[in-house]
Amino acid sequence: ASDVYKRQVPIVSKVTGISLARHATEIMLGKKLKSMNLKPRPCRFIGVKEAVFPFNMFPEVDPVLGPEMRATGEVMGIADNFGMAYYKSQEAAGCILPTSGKVLVTVSDRDKKFIEPIARDLISLGFKIVSTGGTAEYLRGQGVETEVVNKLHEGRPNLGDMITNKQIDLIINTPVDRTSMIDDSFIRMQSIQKKIPYMTTIAAARATVEGIRSAQHVKVSPRSLQEYHS
């Protein structure tokens, strides 16, 4: 079986409370599905799976993803709502989302229309937004308050100084044009070295907002699988 599918089985089993491996073995041994008394069951909680990457062991390597397999494992967060489940999944992967502080936002032109509501949500949650020139110009044009920071080639102080000095608590950076490749690569590598959570897609940024919102309003606490399935 594919390694991908083999990793899905235990995760799906934990979320559903059904031992898929055991039932699959029984079927291979000749048992019929009808005799297993399997019935649809409502799921009262949400599970979010997250991949674990070893980039922290290679701080000089750009953590950009490609077609090759780089994940060394997977973790999962379970909670009563998506936001908390996502927050737990990030925490389990070693990426603890902040509940306050400054967010560096620098996105491609195609993502600017999507980042505006995310920036507004972050401000409503108590965060301050820091953006590079193009992103800041767009956000300000939409009435979103943001601090402007220089890119690496635009002089000091710049975004590199803020990251190095740990003045940034969260990074939202989507891939942009070739002229920004050096900045993007630096941001990704520095975020790992300084243990700053970073998001490289709009979908991840939206999920992060939901996770932070849940963590601000509900205490993050562990629960056993037995409690979830009782």
Predicted regions and their residues:
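Short acidic, glycine/serine/threonine-rich loops at helix termini
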Residues: 2, 10-14, 37, 60, ...
